[in-house]
Amino acid sequence: MSRGRFYLRCESDEWDFIKDLQRPLPFDAAVISDRYLADYPEGHARFGEPRDRLATALDSQGVRWSVDPDTARLEQKGSGKRQRPRAANRPVARAIPLPLSAQRLAEQDAIDALVEAGARHQLGSRAFAAPYLEVATLNDPRLAVNLRLLARSRELAGDRALIAYLQITRRHLLDGSAGGVAERLAGAGAEVIFVRVRRFEPEAATPEEVLAYAAVIEAGTRAGVRMVADCVGRLGAVLVATGADGFATNAWRFRKVSSDLHPAGGGGAAGELLWEVPDAALGLAASAATSVSCQVEGCPAPEGPGGDHLATRIHNLHEFQRAARLAAAEGLAYAARLASSPSPIVRGWAQTLQQLARRAA
């Protein structure tokens, strides 16, 4: 398909939810954290059960999925002890001594070991994602490591699309470093780049932050790469309007990248499940009512949350997919849909899109 892809960021145990979804599916592709494909360890409530049920559920629905190697979290001091037992069981967590660092990945043997470990959970995927470290600037030695990880991944990917992850902090989003990093990843052979910004609140993004994110998207797109905004919640459609190929989030969780490099709770935590209001980029609480209906035929929660958790999750995916496609089709003119939102934050996004349109004129 053309631009406007919506990627489901899978929760750890939602295989039944995925299998039971009716067609047409409310997402275009999916991303599974490598942690959610690890063997269940002894003592775990699911010990002995299949480790790959998320992948199997997606395969049963004919969905293209890829893996987030989720290796940046392994950089934090003490990460070996902070991991949950299942996460500690994954091959990338055992490939070389932790914590990961540019120094520990200086030798080619370590590069090979980490990439080959990451490949074990990607055998059924039609894309191949390279392991990665968080990067600060173009001079960061971790960027050189990421380029080497990408080169080795290219050798194992075969004819599969090669995915790079660009994880930065908000500081380096705003200082302009990330655009150059995206260009370097593209030059090393990445075909898709998932952008992850830590210490950033996407659903409360300021105009300055949206402009900075748009600049990263433009840099990668200009270099010939499909840019995907990862874990951005309802900001995703705005970023698609600026030129992103798509965005990834979940109906409830994975609405931002955890501020902690290695969060104790796993990084997918969320607050209250809200009902996404069409064309308003805001959410309603379970007890709220709305005069705006879901625009997708067959939605199980067309008139608001109604206290139905499952139906609200499905509706939210419908709305994210619809918004992604509209934003891709309308481009910067997508601002008109957001300009009358009750949210001042969202109206600020509309003004930012209008500003970009004036620049492009």
Predicted regions and their residues:
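Glycine/Thr-rich beta-alpha phosphate-binding loop at enzyme active sites
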Residues: A178-A215, T242, K256-E272
